[in-house]
């Protein structure tokens, strides 16, 4: 596939409103729709009104009713970082605010699958809850909610996933993505929804002696970044506030332990550190073991216990990386030999969507493999693993312009009975499928993705902020951009492109390419690194003497010294 570099358009009117900022930063902000300082304010008073989220007043009333009745609250979470931070936030808040009995339950993904299923309700019923609160799940749990209500258990669904045609018969639903919702942002993560519910509850309690939910914004920032939801202005406020508290050392022992285990310095923390250091360690529990380890890490007030649990999470993350590395190599090899839906060899027409399956793949890691491969082939990818009983469980990752959950919905509509359960977002989704219908599904999926891309694929394009002048490629510029975040999904960290002469290279850690480069004619040389450059490549593959690099500016801290480093995302001849 030939990739095309395109520059993000910059509205001159937006630039005018940002003229007091450094030019590189002003261009980056303007290209992301920022037209003035007001959109850069990250104070809590810039959040969308708590009361404007549909269902929130009813949620508060339900929670207060169970407190008055000395009821038992059971929080049922998802098995990822968003679910873990959501669970920890609500458990911490309710316990701190006087609810007599609050506990959590997170389903083992390998035994129970996703969401509030009837089987999970059976498990929950042993604890005799009067109220189940779902976090980061529940909007598709029709049967599970019904099972709970039949047992006389009230259900409060807090979720952010897209709703299906039928909603569960919960007592209350709080979800900015239900049909007809008018809340000003559809981008809240599950932990963002949980924060809004707890903020409304705290206001209703009207007791200044109770700790503010703002004290747990470190959890909100971690879950929001780790779940890769779009960083609209509302989410940027939540993340910025959480980062501010972490940098000042005002964070939960668990978040501190996860970051210290990941060798991150709290004072200089940026959003990417949450996504690359804390998030994967937390997610590793749900992928390989039991997410209750992660939730316990986030709930404990003991620094010693938090460090011990973080060490266990780090061990699981190392195991996950080893499993993922093997699966990734197998997936790359499979793509090379993939046959097209019409039976021709891979040299035939180009597939639009890829489905991959290996009987030895791990259920908890297929999502990571799909994501890595999607970045490599720049097409939607679904990776499948065996789920037992003749069923496959798949994890889908998509590219810009292809709403993967809607693609699956269209496949289900055109081919009734082909899919089992499915759900998700624009960029990620999960599904189940009979193993003997995988080939049939692969054809249907490819055709549906092709329909979505009928106007041309956006995935073949690499968007950048254009070239930098030689004197703009500097540590000062890198420091400015680093401090200007939070950057993330739908508000990407600035990247640039231009031709460099590659003076010298060496391989680092078997997969990474270290380079020393210079801008032709400028006489300035820079350190650069392309992570995972040799993933799927031969180490002996030659590197050109000159290339178009798509890169970001990074501050490399080592032995107390801060130096500029170029992070190379693409090397194009």
Feature locations, PLM:
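A short acidic, amphipathic alpha-helical/loop segment
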Residues: 143-147, 369, 476, 480
């Amino acid at each position: 596939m030939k990739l095309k570099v395109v520059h993000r358009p910059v509205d001159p009117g937006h630039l005018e409103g940002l003229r007091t900022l450094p030019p590189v930063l002003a261009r980056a902000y303007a290209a992301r729709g920022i037209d003035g300082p007001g959109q850069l304010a990250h104070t809590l008073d810039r959040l969308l009104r708590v009361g404007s989220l549909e269902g929130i007043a009813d949620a508060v009333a339900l929670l207060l009713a169970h407190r008055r009745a000395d009821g038992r609250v059971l929080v049922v979470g998802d098995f990822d970082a968003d679910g873990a931070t959501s669970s920890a936030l609500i458990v911490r808040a309710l316990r701190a605010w006087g609810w007599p009995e609050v506990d959590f339950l997170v389903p083992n993904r390998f035994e129970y699958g996703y969401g509030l299923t009837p089987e999970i309700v059976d498990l929950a019923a042993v604890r005799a809850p009067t109220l189940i609160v779902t976090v980061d799940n529940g909007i598709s749990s029709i049967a599970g909610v019904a099972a709970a209500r039949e047992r006389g258990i009230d259900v409060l669904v807090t979720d952010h996933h897209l709703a299906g045609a039928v909603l569960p018969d919960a007592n209350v639903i709080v979800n900015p993505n239900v049909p007809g919702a008018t809340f000003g942002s559809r981008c809240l993560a599950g932990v963002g929804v949980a924060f809004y519910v707890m903020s409304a509850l705290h206001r209703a309690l009207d007791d200044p002696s109770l700790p503010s939910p703002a004290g747990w914004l470190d959890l909100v920032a971690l879950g929001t970044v780790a779940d890769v939801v779009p960083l609209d202005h509302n989410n940027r406020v939540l993340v910025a506030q959480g980062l501010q508290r972490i940098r000042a050392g005002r964070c939960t022992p668990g978040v501190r332990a996860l970051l210290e285990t990941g060798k991150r310095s709290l004072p200089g923390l940026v959003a990417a550190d949450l996504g690359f250091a804390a998030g994967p360690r937390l997610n590793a529990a749900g992928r390989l073991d039991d997410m209750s380890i992660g939730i316990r890490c986030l709930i404990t007030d003991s620094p010693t216990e938090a460090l011990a649990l973080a060490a266990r999470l780090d061990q699981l993350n190392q195991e996950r990386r080893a499993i993922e590395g093997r699966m990734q190599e197998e997936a790359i090899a499979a793509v090379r030999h993939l046959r097209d839906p019409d039976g021709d060899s891979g040299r035939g027409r180009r597939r639009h969507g890829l489905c991959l399956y290996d009987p030895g793949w791990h259920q908890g890691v297929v999502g990571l493999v799909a994501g890595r491969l999607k970045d490599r082939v720049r097409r939607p990818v679904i990776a499948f693993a065996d789920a037992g009983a003749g069923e496959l469980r798949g994890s889908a990752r998509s590219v810009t312009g292809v709403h993967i959950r809607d693609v699956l919905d269209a496949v289900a509509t055109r081919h009734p009975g082909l899919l089992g359960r499915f759900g998700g977002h624009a960029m990620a989704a999960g599904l189940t499928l009979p193993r003997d219908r995988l080939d049939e599904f692969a054809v249907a999926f490819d055709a549906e993705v092709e329909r979505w891309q009928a106007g041309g694929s956006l995935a073949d394009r690499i968007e950048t902020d254009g070239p930098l002048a030689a004197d703009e490629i500097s540590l000062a510029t890198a420091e400015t951009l680093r401090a200007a975040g939070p950057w993330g999904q739908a508000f990407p960290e600035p990247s640039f492109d231009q031709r460099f002469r590659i003076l010298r290279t060496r391989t680092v850690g078997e997969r990474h390419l270290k380079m020393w480069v210079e801008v032709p004619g400028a006489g300035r040389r820079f350190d650069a690194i392309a992570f995972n450059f040799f993933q799927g490549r031969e180490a002996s593959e030659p590197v050109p003497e000159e290339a178009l690099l798509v890169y970001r500016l990074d501050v490399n801290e080592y032995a107390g010294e801060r130096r500029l480093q170029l992070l190379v995302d693409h090397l194009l001849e």
